Amino acid sequence: MALLCGLGQVTLRLWVPLPFQSENRIGFLAAGAFLRSGGMEALTTQLGPGREGSSSPNSKQELQPYSGSSALKPNQVGETSLYGVPIVSLVIDGQERLCLAQISNTLLKNYSYNEIHNRRVALGITCVQCTPVQLEILRRAGAMPISSRRCGMITKREAERLCKSFLGEHKPPKLPENFAFDVVHECAWGSRGSFIPARYNSSRAKCIKCGYCSMYFSPNKFIFHSHRTPDAKYTQPDAANFNSWRRHLKLSDKSATDELSHAWEDVKAMFNGGTRKRTFSLQGGGGGGANSGSGGAGKGGAGGGGGPGCGSEMAPGPPPHKSLRCGEDEAAGPPGPPPPHPQRALGLAAAASGPAGPGGPGGSAGVRSYPVIPVPSKGFGLLQKLPPPLFPHPYGFPTAFGLCPKKDDPVLVAGEPKGGPGTGSSGGAGTAAGAGGPGAGHLPPGAGPGPGGGTMFWGHQPSGAAKDAAAVAAAAAAATVYPTFPMFWPAAGSLPVPPYPAAQSQAKAVAAAVAAAAAAAAAAAGGGGPESLDGAEPAKEGSLGTEERCPSALSRGPLDEDGADEALPPSLGPLPPPPPPPARKSSYVSAFRPVVKDAESIAKLYGSAREAYGSGPARGPVPGTGTGGGYVSPDFLSEGSSSYHSASPDVDTADEPEVDVESNRFPDEEGAQDDTEPRAPSTGGGPDGDQPAGPPSVTSSGADGPTDSADGDSPRPRRRLGPPPAIRSAFGDLVADDVVRRTERSPPSGGYELREPCGPLGGPGAAKVYAPERDEHVKSTAVAAALGPAASYLCTPETHEPDKEDNHSTTADDLETRKSFSDQRSVSQPSPANTDRGEDGLTLDVTGTQLVEKDIENLAREELQKLLLEQMELRKKLEREFQSLKDNFQDQMKRELAYREEMVQQLQIVRDTLCNELDQERKARYAIQQKLKEAHDALHHFSCKMLTPRHCTGNCSFKPPLLP
């Protein structure tokens, strides 16, 4: 291989000056590299620049005309494997051609005839029609159905390009550093110029420098630009519309080497429409994604990359932050500004198979992967210029999974310090990591060599190199640019979400160092206690604030609760740690976070994950960690705040669906909002984020309680809290401000009765409104609260809205609360409404009992009766509803069944008629065949008689006509 690499380098150097006889180069290689390495991939690796790289998945290909064209006999049938599918080939005019129809029916069977045709035209692939003989050969070979009337044949190379444009795998052609194609056109008086692939990063990029006037034109304008030289003839172009430039621009060197012409084809195919759908094809790395439509052959990578050539010359002076795209596996999406390590801009390239050229530091396998600092194309520039948060791409654009598939860009990853090929494609990041991390910035943090390590997309851990401290630091820095991995919303199982590697814990230390400040902020902002929770991330998250947020869903900072991803002020403070993948399987009600019905399922869901995060036992997070609160719900708890299993819900909601305190939503509306949000107060993460005394499980995770404004969807600015006091003296002030703050926060909305702040049952906040006789009750609750999750929050309705006079109802409520407590205790399951609220109706017997005993004394009997009646009515109502639902359902079932039977009958009828028709046809056909046969025989005999009576031996029943 070394030899070959060497060779690759040589070719590279020679390449520009003299297009020397392709044949000995290719022939030579063909013998060695090419065949040995099993395919184009290898070839590119050796021929580097010239060839397209991924061009052919595995081909022995048109090298044949060179190496042994003598071997090819006309109409010789062969079989070629294209993307692993055997395709019949036929030698036509000394060239092996593949059967397009067969390709369409196998590899491209998911695309319509039109799509295939249009793409073929766009790629400039001409189809050669078979002769009838060849068609018959193809039928016999099984490539075409017997009924086929014609078949187009395309060369293997064309077939590969066609399939590649559909099936992905877009690497821009590899071209040497300052390469330019010499092109000419003959429209009007013609002109010649240099097409500079490195500048060709969008369909309208001015990438052709006119040879006469040295001005730059886009390809479609260049064909209308001509210089009238003395000897020029005026040619009226047949179809010079702007987009036909691919037809009119030709390489001036007619005898260009194969690779050159192939590279030219690939470049031409680059922005050639075709696939609008690949606009963000995160395919070619950022490449496809970034180019504004990357399109066509999708050679996206190149495109976005700043042009196939991706020559970094093209980068001449863009601010480093345009971040390099590595030509080949392109950086993961346009990274955010990488100030963290400016050297990265070019450094990355080095890492990712360095600009140093084949031999260069990172130079992998001797191929230059031309990183390019794109001259941004439209879409791309847009993405980069917007402060990301305004532009969140649904799938964390920068890295999202488009990158995953390219895990093994063989060329690149080949020689690299395996930063973990895993990250390989992610912008060579892994590789870069090896290189001391300059590239790391490129990756989405998870992917960074550091914590998330190579595992970012592909499960495997980054190898040692990636874990260097340096790398980790870089990763942390990177993290500033990209949020930590869960780039996407908790899309349930579908994403390739690797389990977070253990590497995190190590990374933790370094990252912490890197982002000490951030971490501090984090502690303050308490985005879920990054430290305790997900070891590796603190730094990342903290630092996230400092850089632009990445436009990815993750960027939802603590505050954009509803996933609205509104523009986040960059300093948002740490993100909640990413959801531990295991949890992902749960069925999410909302796209953004689970509405978990009760604490136990939560424990189940996240238990394991949390352990991974080191946040302690399944339930109470480590009491010590101020922030630790029940691990932040992975899916971005409400504002990264309250701990998941908040203490028992406001119990009173048991009876009627109450409007949610914070956001005035009815329970059902709340589905989307994290259920923990209503309970943030209860977790003691009251807006102050003070922790209630007591159960660790309630410690707010540094929460600053939800701060949604009344309608719960415009995130309010986050309050920074001071480090949570370890324990507030019986939650006095907590409740007090809680209550106060909340009152001011949620204006009663329109018609609903707004249940007002829930102070912890009987915390002094509540005490303010109770009659003194409640005091002892209060104490008891304090105790209860201290006991465990059941710090039930009693919502005293309107207590603090002086304008509502029925404060007395506090008692009723209380009572409800109590009651529902007892209910719950007996049922040990959240009562229906609770479930509705999506709250964990987990109650502790202890508390329940205490409450009940204490309060039954305090409850007047009529109140109990009233309650009972309400409950009964409620139950009746529910039963009625249930009944009606059941009836509806049964009706529906009946209707369905009837419908189904009818369908079955109809199908039967259709089938019978079809069968009859078929029989008829068969008979008719048979009759016609008979007639034809008779006619044929008659003709045959007749001609026999006419021409050569002697051939027709006696068995001819035909009488010679009587002569006149």
From Swiss-Prot:
Q: Please tell me one Gene Ontology term that the record gives under cellular component.
A: transcription regulator complex
- Its primary localisation, in coarse terms, equals nucleus
Could you tell me which Gene3D superfamilies the record lists for this protein? SAND domain-like, Ski
Where is it located?
A: Nucleus
Report, as the record phrases it, the tissue specificity of this protein.
Answer: Expressed in brain with higher levels in embryo than adult. Expressed by migratory precursors of Purkinje cells in the postnatal brain. Also expressed in adult testis.
Q: Where is the composition biased (Basic and acidic residues)?
A: 798-808
**UniProt-annotated stretches for the region Disordered:** 45-72, 278-365, 414-461, 525-587, 610-768, 794-842
SMART domains the record matches? c-SKI_SMAD_bind
Mind telling me which residue stretches traverse the membrane in this protein? none
Q: Which GO terms describe its biological process?
A: negative regulation of BMP signaling pathway; negative regulation of DNA-templated transcription
Instruction: Report the function annotation for this chain.
Output: Inhibits BMP signaling. Acts as a transcriptional corepressor of LBX1.
Q: What is this protein called?
A: SKI family transcriptional corepressor 1
Its taxonomic path starts at:
Eukaryota, Metazoa, Chordata, Craniata, Vertebrata
UniProt lists the gene as Skor1
